[in-house]
């Protein structure tokens, strides 16, 4: 008797479009819009840098032309930002190691040359626009029968522009302006500017004041050298009266105010340009009111592909934010995610495995650091999830992925009585018996008297604890930031999966989520407990309790996301706990956290 098949495989599903393939042209369009906004900013800056009748049409036209020239020299700044853009900050264990990393020659010279090109153009336009009003000409007007001379006021403003270039470079590298505090921004440009306008003005004002106060003192120390170099350089281009001694002191209150105004406008211009770059390039997944993956022939497959793109962090962040939008606002996509099971691995299983891997990666890093204290092993990429051991053998499989027992490099089948003597083997290799002279294994403590040795160690430790060497000491805050460099991505992933679980009661018709709720709660509880135990073990030895929130800022945000997920799922599914096949430990832990939350609220 032949049995007929009652189920047939579905038709061949077309391969989903890569998420980055859809995102790349969108990023190019956003970069062009950011360049247009930068052009408008350069025109406004050139208008404020010029001096003349503000109502004149010729003055406006000249400002527009200068704005195009400023944009030509400001464009390398955008190119530098795009080449160095990142979604997470690289954090070292100590400030000294952080400075060595941030101010490496490759990074420093690239950023310095970029600012030198852009800032020099803006400062020269300001000096040229106010040359007649405050006597900032390069060459001073000579008297009758005298050669022209170099104008020291011009030399001072040029030196001030170089100080401004150095200040902007140091600020950009030290504060890591290439990676924003929030990796992805989903607000309009004008709203974002208005939200940060007060901070922009205050920050630019403080930086301008610091430059204006520092420059006169440094110029007074280096005045003779700067004057000789400027006079020698000018004499190569123009015929001037060359003198090695500078004239009278050029600085006045009016020149100081002009230098402050120039620095303030330049700093404000670069801060707004940075916000322009962020608000366009780090924008969210909404394109004309439509999500990015909706343009694909397989929206769910494209979304999962974007969330699994590890080599392109910006693509991963935007795809994760799109999942958050779907979980909060799009019931139709939620239904399609729950019903998309016609695959080798369903979409829900893909989303769950992504969240599980990120939770286990964090928990594994914390366990390694807590047990061994090896920070490099905890933060390395190999300290994440271990490979699965239940890999079936096949002739074409990679043998390196199969866990094997390493064997010693000798014949293990020879009986012990037939083995060779280690002493005879050494005689064969060395040709003589090994020396029986005892080796001094005590080290330097046996050569130097113990009292002197203790004094030296005490002096070195006291000298190392001095405030001067504070930048080389490892701090708890930097360690925690390096363990979770992108807390935003972790929190959004956990919150998105939690929202999908909460809405599964309404939209999950096949029951694909109910089977994994116990596993989700187990992952959440285990990761949360590891975070809590790690924090408690460090708080005991923490000397300053006032900085605990700052030191554990990233880990606290991750713990809050996990805690809220446990509380929300427990509250929503408390009537079905007996049907979820929860382990007694996880069920007890969920109820404890839920009751603590209710009692505190």
Curated annotation (Swiss-Prot):
Major localization class: nucleus
GO cellular component: cytoplasm; mitotic nuclear bridge midzone; mitotic nuclear bridge midzone membrane domain; mitotic spindle pole body; nuclear envelope; nuclear membrane; nuclear pore; nuclear pore transmembrane ring
Keywords assigned: Cytoplasm, Cytoskeleton, Membrane, mRNA transport, Nuclear pore complex, Nucleus, Protein transport, Translocation, Transmembrane, Transmembrane helix, Transport
Domain of life the protein comes from: Eukaryota
Membrane-traversing stretches: 35-55, 59-79, 107-127, 154-174, 183-203, 257-277
GO MF terms, alphabetically ordered: spindle pole body-nuclear membrane anchor activity
InterPro entries per UniProt: Nucleoporin_prot_Ndc1/Nup (IPR019049)
Membrane topology, Cytoplasmic segments: 1-34, 80-106, 175-182, 278-601
Residue ranges, Perinuclear space side: 56-58, 128-153, 204-256
Compartmental location: Nucleus, Nuclear pore complex; Nucleus membrane; Cytoplasm, Cytoskeleton, Microtubule organizing center, Spindle pole body
Membrane-related topology note: Multi-pass membrane protein
Known role: Component of the nuclear pore complex (NPC) and the spindle pole body (SPB), which plays a key role in de novo assembly and insertion of both structures in the nuclear envelope. Involved in the formation of the bipolar mitotic spindle. Anchors the spindle pole body in the nuclear envelope.
Complex and partners: Component of the nuclear pore complex (NPC). NPC constitutes the exclusive means of nucleocytoplasmic transport. NPCs allow the passive diffusion of ions and small molecules and the active, nuclear transport receptor-mediated bidirectional transport of macromolecules such as proteins, RNAs, ribonucleoparticles (RNPs), and ribosomal subunits across the nuclear envelope. Due to its 8-fold rotational symmetry, all subunits are present with 8 copies or multiples thereof.
Protein name: Nuclear envelope protein ndc1
Gene from which this protein is expressed: cut11
